[in-house]
Amino acid sequence: MPKYDSHLKCSFCGKSQEQVRKLIAGPGVYICDECVELCNDILDEELLDVPPASTGERDGTGQKQKKSGQPRRRLTLEELPKPTAIKQYLDEYVIGQDEAKKVLSVAVYNHYKRLNLLERNQEIDPGDAVELQKSNILLVGPTGSGKTLLAQTLAKILEVPFAVADATTLTEAGYVGEDVENILLRLLQVADLDVEEAQRGIIYIDEIDKIARKSENPSITRDVSGEGVQQALLKMLEGTVANVPPQGGRKHPYQDCIQIDTSNILFICGGAFVGLEKVIEQRFGKKSMGFVRPGEGPSKEKRTADVLRQAEPDDLVKFGLIPEFIGRIPVMACLNPLDEDALIAILTQPRNAIVKQYQTLLGMDHVELDFQPDAVRAIATEAHRRKTGARALRGIVEELMLDVMYELPSREDLTHCLITREMVEKRSTAELLLHPSSLPKPESA
């Protein structure tokens, strides 16, 4: 027989340890299993009565969410943003990549028209109406070329829900990782749990090349994060009614699922596809032959981009994507690698350019910040050497500005900062703090 302490009682109902199955101790208090169960019932009832959270703020992708209880505004055919207007907006934030911008602009415009036609067909006899099928998109480009930024910029102007997902976290059902239905869950959350709105949305799946199978031939072993994920995505890309767990499927296996029809959801996939150019060159039987002087001809990155534009479905199959998956993404656009001139433009021209961001930061401390043209080019040269595209720019500028950003809030005698090429090469702006009364001047050649 277990021994009970008759002095121990539940602090809520007053029952002794002998009268309950379990008594849980806390700092000076106790609670029995019956009270715990009662609290769970109360919380469940409260959660059922609470409407979805409404913030009216922008979500993680930068898209403004609709307020709870208010339907998202539907654009008429005359109000639809034209492809040229969409591209002009993308030009304000993303440098270059005109081909990819045109592909995305046309795809988004056609997506709007498909939704508009569906609404009109519901008002007439649907049997006589023409159905417009969606054309999912594949973006191919090196790291840091702007694939994700294009998607995030699109999210700012769209009147339909837009979600961004990462393919590297996905695994086949039953294994550690995320189910493919979690992609739809992100879109559902952006739509404020409005199923009808989510079914009109757009999903961008990043790093899609990371789910390529390890070899061209089908494997006899289980590839849970490669071919298995591609198989799971097939019906979702084409159009199916998917069961989406609103709290995530792995931790809450017994919850009620929400059904979402993906037939009208536009999918945009992006990836670097490192090594695809070698597969294409093997198809053409091309080898690097002859002698080329350094500096002559296009750069290696430019040659790679030119080769990728000749990619065919068979090349993607050899890379590791299954034919069924490729067939559901009929449109492909290639992004150009960024050269030094493009990196300079990224530093200075976009609305959210890095130089403008730091000028705003220092301006809040009443300090004027200027970059000499040679300094900007030196930053771009170093970023190009690191071969990580535009992502390298912020790291270089952060390292460069560390000393000034650290000392500046405590210095009232510093009112002007001029960044020179020498400072960029030294990766330090410490000398600015030594002589704040005079502007540093570049050494004469």
Curated annotation (Swiss-Prot):
One of the GO biological process terms: cell division
Cellular component GO terms held in the UniProt record: HslUV protease complex
UniProt-listed InterPro entries: AAA+_ATPase, ATP-dep_Clp_protease_ClpX, ATPase_AAA_core, Clp_ATPase_C, Clp_protease_ATP-bd_su_ClpX, ClpX_bact, P-loop_NTPase, Znf_CppX_C4
All residue ranges annotated as the ClpX-type ZB domain in the record: 1-51
Residues engaged in binding ATP: P142, T143, G144, S145, G146, K147, T148, L149
Skewed-composition ranges (Basic residues): 64-74
Paired cysteines (S-S): none
Keyword hit for Nucleotide-binding: yes
Gene3D superfamilies from the UniProt entry: 1.10.8.60, ClpX chaperone, C4-type zinc finger domain, P-loop containing nucleotide triphosphate hydrolases
SMART domains: AAA (SM00382), ClpB_D2-small (SM01086), zf-C4_ClpX (SM00994)
Ribosomal protein among keywords: no
Family: Belongs to the ClpX chaperone family.
Subunit and partners: Component of the ClpX-ClpP complex. Forms a hexameric ring that, in the presence of ATP, binds to fourteen ClpP subunits assembled into a disk-like structure with a central cavity, resembling the structure of eukaryotic proteasomes.
Alphabetized NCBIfam families for the sequence: clpX, PRK05342.1
Record function comment: ATP-dependent specificity component of the Clp protease. It directs the protease to specific substrates. Can perform chaperone functions in the absence of ClpP.
Name this protein carries in UniProt: ATP-dependent Clp protease ATP-binding subunit ClpX
Source organism (scientific name): Synechocystis sp. (strain ATCC 27184 / PCC 6803 / Kazusa)
